[in-house]
């Protein structure tokens, strides 16, 4: 009889992160055991209660309140200007809009770079004031001490290596880990965050072959975005995934809808009804 690999074995439907029967909050233990079962899982960004509630009802097990909100919702050109106050407000809204998903709050630029103590203060705000179940921060070896202190203090950490958008002024937007030296550094970063206690690590804009190697080497889950199909999980920015983002989107994005067109057409139809005197009608009026 042919033996199925761990990745091919069907997950216990009652324990599956996506499509599972449970109604309680997803925990860090659920995430780590999913890798042990060879179960892949999806993650989406969310920045408000209403959107988060839709994704929660759809069964998305993990949501990231990313500082990508700076680009997607707050009108900034990069993620760099996003503040901890803004991330706390957005994270709290997403927590309120969900009942099952694990909510991960991003630590924005300037909220942890000074060192472990600053990182702990910032992460504590997201946990206490917003109610997130974990925090995310960028950096591999350079963030080792911050991750270590947060984990020692009882705050779960999702790390983020490869392309780190908060470092755009230094790194630019380009693929990370190409070439032997860069690949070895990314592997060192991945092992460093695992050793520091991170429960998962995001790999952004990394060659697929390198991301696959990192996934094999680590015992914690890898979350890919532009990192090929072999990572343990995949994440997309929801406005990209649903076609709300205007202009060109990254190559790694798959659009599952075209909300920008749907919303634009609906707004035009409303405007034309108002101008033409066909809204509101009697059925929309009160007496």
From Swiss-Prot:
Protein EC: 2.1.2.11
Binding site for 3-methyl-2-oxobutanoate: 67-68, 106, 136
GO biological process: pantothenate biosynthetic process
Cofactor names: Mg(2+)
Molecular function per GO: 3-methyl-2-oxobutanoate hydroxymethyltransferase activity; magnesium ion binding
Gene Ontology CC annotations of this record: cytoplasm
InterPro entries: Pantoate_hydroxy_MeTrfase, Pyrv/PenolPyrv_kinase-like_dom, Pyrv_kinase-like_dom_sf
Pathway(s) of this molecule: Cofactor biosynthesis; (R)-pantothenate biosynthesis; (R)-pantoate from 3-methyl-2-oxobutanoate: step 1/2
Superkingdom of origin organism: Bacteria
Subunit structure: Homodecamer; pentamer of dimers.
Name of this chain's protein: 3-methyl-2-oxobutanoate hydroxymethyltransferase
Species of origin: Streptomyces avermitilis (strain ATCC 31267 / DSM 46492 / JCM 5070 / NBRC 14893 / NCIMB 12804 / NRRL 8165 / MA-4680)
């Amino acid at each position: 009889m042919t033996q199925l690999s761990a990745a091919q074995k069907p997950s216990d439907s009652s324990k599956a992160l996506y499509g599972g029967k449970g109604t309680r909050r997803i925990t860090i233990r659920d995430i780590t055991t999913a890798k042990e079962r060879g179960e892949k899982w999806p993650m989406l960004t969310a920045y408000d209660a209403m959107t988060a509630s839709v994704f929660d009802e759809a069964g998305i097990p993990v949501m990231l309140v990313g500082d990508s909100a700076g680009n997607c919702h707050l009108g900034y050109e990069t993620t760099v200007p996003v503040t901890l106050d803004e991330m706390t407000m957005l994270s709290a809204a997403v927590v309120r809009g969900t009942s099952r998903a694990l909510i991960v709050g991003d630590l924005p630029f300037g909220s942890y770079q000074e060192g472990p103590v600053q990182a702990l203060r910032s992460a504590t705000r997201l946990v206490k004031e917003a109610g997130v179940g974990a925090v995310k921060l960028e950096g591999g070896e350079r963030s080792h001490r911050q991750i270590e202190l947060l984990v020692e203090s009882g705050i779960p950490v999702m790390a983020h290596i490869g392309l780190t958008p908060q470092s755009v002024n230094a790194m630019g937007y380009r693929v990370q880990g190409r070439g032997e030296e860069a690949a070895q550094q990314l592997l060192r970063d991945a092992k460093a965050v695992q050793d520091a206690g991170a429960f998962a690590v995001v790999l952004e804009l990394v060659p697929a072959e390198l991301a696959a190697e990192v996934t094999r080497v680590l015992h914690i889950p890898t979350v890919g975005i532009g990192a090929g199909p072999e990572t343990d999980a995949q994440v997309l920015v929801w406005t990209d995934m649903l076609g709300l983002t205007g202009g060109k989107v990254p190559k790694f994005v798959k659009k599952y809808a075209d909300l920008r067109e749907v919303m634009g057409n609906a707004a035009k139809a409303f405007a034309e009804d108002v101008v033409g005197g066909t809204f509101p009608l009697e059925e929309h009026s009160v007496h």
